Amino acid sequence: YAADAAYLVDRCDSNEYLENLSNIFRKEAIDFYIPGTDVELIFCAVNKQLIKDKFSVHTIISSIEVITFSNNKYKTASFLRENGLNYPRTDYLKDIDIEGIEYPVIVKPSVGCRSIGVYKINNLEELTPHLENTKDIVIQECVGNEDEEYTCTVVKIGDELSPVLALKRVL
């Protein structure tokens, strides 16, 4: 990645995080802030008005409700299905017929980030340990390959939508 500057900041659950942002906002004369990681989204949505009032910086971020909804893989897949959009087949692990699974599949928490608890499963033997605790675990059709990841962003300000930015990241 290319950037004019880079900063190491404390975790967003740290008391120092907002102070870290404040220093960057002042030093770099920031007008708009777009949080870059899943873990800071809720913090930034909650503190959006504070950041604007205290630092005159506009945080470009969805509402807490949208973030909470979209963090849930099952709800997101259901929304995509209901709106005629493509999505990987997604079910709660507790609700599926184990014998009918077409491998490989992805097993992961319904709500999570940073690939924590995400497993590519190639057969029943690999799936078996995950069957012990199926609470809030989803199973998804495996798309792409393990060397790449897809992400998509749309920004809405008022009634205006930006073009869709779809990225394929090579891991």
Where on the chain are the PLM-derived regions?
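Short loop/helix-cap segments at secondary-structure boundaries that form the rim of catalytic
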Residues: 1-3, 97-101, 129-133
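ATP-binding N-terminal substructure of ATP-dependent carboxylate-amine bond-forming enzymes
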Residues: 1-60
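Short acidic-hydrophobic, aromatic-tinged amphipathic segments that line or gate anion-handling sites
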Residues: 6-12, 89-94, 119-122
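Glycine-/Pro-rich loop/turn segments that contact NAD(P) or position catalytic residues
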Residues: 64-93
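ATP-grasp fold ATP-binding core
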Residues: 80, 90, 101-116, 135-146, ...
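Phosphate-binding site of ATP-dependent enzymes
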Residues: 122-171
